[in-house]
């Protein structure tokens, strides 16, 4: 019997699966908390907040998603046997997945430090936890006292045999040609993240329309649980604008040329012009006795000028169809491409679009270079990786150099875009790594990484199925009017209402990512954005084809050499050697990476062609097979009464009958043979794994006497009969 109030438990059916919300059971001291369950997967989501002591200039929302190994009945493999260190890449990506649709739902100006924690406490390794975490984050905030615009729910859309599937299992995702995670309110889609195996744009739109309808019961469930268990919302009063002061700032900014500053095409020059306007405005205001002593008012100058800049940019687009850099709404920035510019890399490309530049390098490695990922679903192996770097110099800034969440997210998106065009491991067994170094950035740097990454793959000679390009689309929405922008720059991203990244081939989509700053996006807007993006993508692909239209026919001379051998499975033991002695010697001497399959298939990666040939010979040494009529140098391993056993190859022994040890008759084997002695013998018979040899045949040939297999066979058979006669005589003697 519990002293607590009974928990509130609600459930609904979505996509043929039961989704369960339960609150008032765990983590009740949090501002808002609940568990979200599907099958045996349970995610505990909590939200806490505290008032801000001072305005930070941004909304301090922290989202952390974590997977605990106990959830899948496993113990962490770290030295301390606990989850320590920084979050995994998957945890980071899902944290971003939660943050992106949740953040816009908080009111602007909320003076609260908010932390959302999502912990996977049970995993059936069948139902994915990421969409439960996104939905749970929304529900937890709905239950809390924090103001929140509306409930959102997340879902995953797959496609099997041409049919959409909502929230497919982990195994079904592997078979699906579509894997789209989306979040939506009751009115519209607010976030999209996904990948596809070259799927047409209209199918993506249909999937989102279908998925939006399917997840409505989850939104209804959130509203219901809020009614039953939600806290009273804290009153939120937006900071009242000082209209008189704002008007004065705008007039001064206009006087000092803010309109002209926002028409400067070059990013850095525009930045300097805007800074100069702001400094002039502040200088005047600091001399005004009405404001000189009010630092709190002066601190709002940047925000006021920023809002004015946003208004100027948007109005120019709406009224004049002109953007900051002078383009219309559908034009892609000028493109410059260079491939093969780094002589010692396996593949390289420098992709420049406007003031955004990405240097992409492809490196090929062996199967031992793949990445092993430890997760709740078990250990998986990645043979393709794309790492995106965004150093501070790319935007002319000074900042600490470390891998940020943003870099991990952009790299994951670019990786999704390119993974479907790579050849299978059966035809191209290399591990492939792309590094995208952002050297300059003025928007769409992740899309530049996709374009440059594809070109570097082609320069490396990777036989991709089709080239891929990416482009970022923006949106300006004023009342009922909307304008889609092609290939947005950084300021258009900041001042616009949408960032919709789309990558694909000429035939279809391979990756999408959409974030918006408004309450939702209709499918009509998404359809327009995708159609416009397709035209831009085809243009970009045509520019890429001018630099390199097909993958190079050969790999770089500096790339690893690859070959496959098939050996007798019985020889594997000898190739490996006791304690791995032989295989270690081969890899040490040649520098090769060797993967041995139990079936006898051996995959070899060597740094040079010479090393490859050496590795082959060293492996084949242990897999030699005797040939009939061929001479071999053997070592005497065992002496028997009727002959000797010699090792003629690794793991291959031959029996030499006493009658075949010498030309003349000998009474005992030891008359001509000693243990450990080397001698040349000829293979005269092979029956299965049994090998018979003759020293006598070698001696006869040395004397110039022609030897034939029949002759040795006759001697062999005769002597075997003679042996049986002597054996039978001994038996008769014992009987008498």
UniProtKB/Swiss-Prot annotation:
**Where is this protein primarily located?**
cytoplasm
What Gene3D superfamilies does the record tag this protein with?
GHMP Kinase, N-terminal domain, K Homology domain, type 1, Nucleic acid-binding proteins
Q: Which GO terms describe its biological process?
A: mRNA catabolic process; RNA processing
- What family does this belong to? Belongs to the polyribonucleotide nucleotidyltransferase family.
Annotated membrane-spanning segments are none
Q: Which PROSITE patterns match?
A: KH_TYPE_1, S1
Compartments, as annotated in UniProt: Cytoplasm
In Gene Ontology terms, what is one molecular function of this protein?
magnesium ion binding
Name by which UniProt lists this protein: Polyribonucleotide nucleotidyltransferase
According to its UniProt entry, what is the function of this protein?
A: Involved in mRNA degradation. Catalyzes the phosphorolysis of single-stranded polyribonucleotides processively in the 3'- to 5'-direction.
Q: What reaction is this protein's catalytic activity?
A: RNA(n+1) + phosphate = RNA(n) + a ribonucleoside 5'-diphosphate
The UniProt entry, under InterPro entries, shows: ExoRNase_PH_dom1, ExoRNase_PH_dom2, ExoRNase_PH_dom2_sf, KH_dom, KH_dom_type_1, KH_dom_type_1_sf, NA-bd_OB-fold, PNPase
Q: Name one GO cellular component term.
A: cytosol
Q: Where does Mg(2+) bind?
A: 493, 499
Q: Does the keyword Magnesium apply?
A: yes
What are the required cofactors?
Answer: Mg(2+)
Concerning HAMAP family, the annotation shows: PNPase (MF_01595)
Under NCBIfam families, the record lists: polynuc_phos, PRK11824.1
Where in the sequence does UniProt note compositional bias of the Basic and acidic residues kind?
720-736
Residues of the region (Disordered) are 710-736
| Enzyme Commission number, as recorded | 2.7.7.8
Q: Which domain of life is it from?
A: Bacteria
Residue span(s) of domain KH: 560-619
User: Which keywords annotate this record?
Assistant: Cytoplasm, Magnesium, Metal-binding, Nucleotidyltransferase, RNA-binding, Transferase
């Amino acid at each position: 019997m519990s002293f607590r109030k009974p928990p509130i438990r609600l459930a609904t059916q979505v996509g043929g699966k039961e989704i369960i919300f339960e609150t008032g059971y765990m983590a009740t001291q949090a501002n808002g908390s609940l568990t979200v369950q599907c099958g045996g997967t349970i995610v505990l989501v909590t939200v806490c907040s505290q008032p801000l002591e001072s305005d930070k200039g941004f909304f301090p929302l922290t989202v952390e998603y974590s997977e605990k190994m106990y959830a899948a009945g496993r113990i962490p493999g770290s030295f301390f046997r606990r989850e320590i260190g920084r979050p995994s890449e998957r945890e980071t990506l899902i944290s971003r997945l939660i943050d992106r649709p949740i953040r816009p739902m908080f009111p602007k100006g909320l003076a609260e430090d908010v932390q959302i924690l999502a912990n996977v406490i049970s995993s059936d390794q069948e139902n994915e936890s990421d969409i439960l975490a996104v939905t749970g984050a929304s529900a937890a905030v709905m239950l809390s006292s924090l103001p929140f615009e509306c409930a959102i729910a997340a879902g995953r859309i797959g496609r099997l045999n041409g049919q959409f599937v909502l929230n497919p299992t982990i195994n079904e995702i592997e078979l699906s040609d579509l894997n789209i995670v989306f979040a939506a309110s009751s009115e519209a889609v607010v976030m999209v993240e996904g990948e596809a195996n070259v799927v047409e744009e209209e199918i993506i739109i249909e999937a989102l329309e279908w998925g939006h309808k399917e997840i409505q019961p989850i939104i209804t469930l959130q509203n219901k649980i809020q009614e039953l268990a939600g806290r009273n919302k804290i009153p939120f009063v937006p900071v009242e604008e000082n209209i008189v002061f704002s008007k004065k700032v705008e007039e001064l900014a206009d006087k000092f040329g803010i309109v002209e500053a926002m028409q400067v095409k070059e990013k850095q020059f525009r930045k300097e012009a805007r800074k100069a306007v702001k400094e002039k405005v502040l200088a005047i205001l600091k001399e005004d006795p009405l404001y000189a002593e009010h630092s709190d008012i002066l601190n709002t100058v940047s925000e006021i000028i920023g809002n004015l800049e946003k208004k100027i940019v948007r109005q120019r687009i709406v009224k004049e169809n002109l953007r900051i850099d002078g383009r219309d709404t559908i034009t892609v920035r000028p493109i410059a491409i260079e491939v093969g510019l780094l002589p010692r890399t396996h593949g390289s490309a420098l992709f420049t679009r406007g003031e955004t530049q990405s240097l992409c390098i492809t490196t090929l490695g062996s199967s031992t270079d793949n990445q092993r990922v430890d997760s709740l679903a078990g250990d998986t192996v990645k043979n393709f990786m794309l790492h995106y770097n965004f150093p501070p110099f790319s935007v002319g800034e000074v900042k600490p150099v470390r891998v940020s969440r943003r870099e991990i997210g952009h790299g994951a998106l670019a990786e999704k875009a390119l993974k479907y065009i790579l050849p299978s491991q059966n035809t191209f067994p290399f591990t492939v790594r792309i590094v995208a170094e952002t050297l300059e950035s003025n928007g769409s740097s992740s899309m530049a990484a996709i374009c440059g990454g594809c070109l570097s793959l082609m320069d490396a000679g990777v036989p991709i199925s089709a080239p891929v390009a990416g482009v970022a689309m923006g949106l300006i929405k004023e009342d009922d009017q909307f304008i889609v922008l092609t290939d947005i720059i950084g300021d258009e991203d900041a001042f616009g209402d949408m960032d919709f990244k789309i990558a694909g081939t000429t035939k279809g989509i391979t990756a999408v990512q959409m974030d918006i700053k408004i309450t939702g996006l209709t499918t009509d807007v998404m359809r327009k954005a995708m159609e416009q993006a397709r035209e831009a993508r085809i243009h970009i692909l045509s520019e890429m084809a001018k630099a390199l239209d097909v993958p190079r026919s050969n790999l770089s001379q500096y790339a690893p050499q690859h070959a496959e051998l098939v050996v007798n499975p019985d020889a594997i033991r000898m190739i490996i050697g006791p304690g791995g002695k032989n295989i270690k010697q081969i890899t040490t001497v040649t520098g090769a990476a060797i993967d041995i399959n139990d079936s006898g298939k051996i995959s070899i990666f060597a740094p040079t062609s010479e090393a490859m040939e050496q590795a082959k010979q060293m492996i084949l040494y242990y897999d030699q097979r005797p040939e009939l009529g061929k001479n071999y140098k053997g070592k005497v391993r065992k002496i028997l009464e009727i002959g000797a056993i010699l090792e003629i190859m690794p793991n291959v022994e031959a029996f030499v009958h006493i009658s075949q040890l010498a030309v003349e008759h000998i009474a005992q084997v030891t008359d001509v043979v000693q243990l450990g002695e080397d001698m040349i013998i000829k293979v005269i018979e092979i029956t299965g794994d049994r090998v018979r040899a003759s020293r006598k045949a070698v001696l006869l040939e040395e004397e110039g006497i022609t030897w034939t297999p029949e002759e040795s066979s006759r001697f062999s058979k005769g002597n075997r009969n003679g042996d049986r006669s002597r054996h039978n005589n001994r038996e008769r003697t014992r009987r008498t």
